[in-house]
């Protein structure tokens, strides 16, 4: 390592990913700014894919934090999203072609009355335009090739679902969901349950595991790393990725028992 090379960083860089940028592209951007900023080479990965059309919290793991990235994939997430009623697209968002329409636009009262049916354990069919593999091929590749893609139902959990704002032909909801939940599918199914059709026009992740959108930095701030801005002002510590794990305080005897692999009978 040369005198000018800075030590490899370890921790979390929390990006506020803009719409249009893929998660893999975001990882590439962080690798570049670290290299240009003079940091030693280190592992970089993300803690949960965020679709290019979505925006918001994207945890980027650096160095030793990459060992915790898998846990972040399993963490619950919170999203704000807007459903526009009247049209369903093949991609279930604004990028696709309209495949079904409805003249029925549900009222806010009807929407509110329907949401409890989508709270708790549910089953949903993922979008055909998704990265799920079917017989070794990505579903979106099959869909783009014009093949009829049959998506199997999956179990997921919606911990909370609430209305944030209503507008003409649209509603914005906030959903706290378990891993593996597809917001586009949730929007489709809510619209269908209301006797309408719908697709997502806005999607923002506001929380991923313990990480909040208030902690996230813009791409402009990340780019400053390449120009010599201190990384330590932006980097969250390794343990920040564990902040949502329940803590159990033990007395010295119980702590010693745990270290020895013994079961604590009083718990």
For each of these PLM feature ranges, what is it?
Residues 43-73, 141-144:
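Glycine/acidic-rich beta-strand-loop module
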Residues 130, 134-153, 158-159:
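Extended alpha-helical targeting/anchoring segments
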Residues 70-85, 149-163:
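Structural signature of FAD isoalloxazine-binding scaffolds in flavoprotein oxidoreductases
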Residues 32, 40, 55, 59, ...:
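The conserved catalytic core of RNA pseudouridine synthases
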Residues 71-124:
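Acidic, low-complexity central loop/insert segments
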Residues 60, 81, 136, 186, ...:
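Residue-level signal for inorganic ion chemistry
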Residues 1-53, 170, 193-267:
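Accessory RNA 3′-end/elbow-binding domains used by RNA modification enzymes
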